[in-house]
Amino acid sequence: MPKEFSRSQRVAEQVRRELAELIRLEVKDPRVGFITLTDVEITPDYAHAKVFFTSMKGEEGLDEILTGLHRASGFLRRELGKRVRIHTLPELHFHYDSSVERGSRMSQLIDQVVRDDDARHKDDPES
């Protein structure tokens, strides 16, 4: 059975796609060039949208990226209004999403434990 999404979830996904395209193609600020939008959460009244992003640089230069995004937020919101038809255009709030880095770190730790365990069992003559 297909997963059902609420209207606000569909709108949030459309906002994420449109913002990603706008940032990639229209925003000329080099500070925001290498980011990926990971999620958008919109309040039920559509007044606010939390826009989560990651950067190829990790947390390096995060302040500059946030400054660039905040400076572009008016332009992004205006252009978003031309592309997405909703009764209230949300105010954009940008947040760094560190979950990708945490997930990568967890994966590295698990891989290391598996390698250590394999090496221990290889050296153990009883196994």
UniProtKB/Swiss-Prot annotation:
InterPro entries: KH_dom-like_a/b, RbfA, RbfA_dom_sf. Gene3D superfamilies: 3.30.300.20. It is found in: Cytoplasm. It comes from the Bacteria. Keywords: Cytoplasm, Ribosome biogenesis. One of its GO terms (biological process) is maturation of SSU-rRNA. One of its GO terms (molecular function) is ribosomal small subunit binding. One of its GO terms (cellular component) is cytosol. Monomer. Binds 30S ribosomal subunits, but not 50S ribosomal subunits or 70S ribosomes. NCBIfam families: rbfA. One of several proteins that assist in the late maturation steps of the functional core of the 30S ribosomal subunit. Associates with free 30S ribosomal subunits (but not with 30S subunits that are part of 70S ribosomes or polysomes). Required for efficient processing of 16S rRNA. May interact with the 5'-terminal helix region of 16S rRNA. Belongs to the RbfA family. PANTHER family: RIBOSOME-BINDING FACTOR A, CHLOROPLASTIC-RELATED. This is Ribosome-binding factor A. It comes from Aromatoleum aromaticum (strain DSM 19018 / LMG 30748 / EbN1).
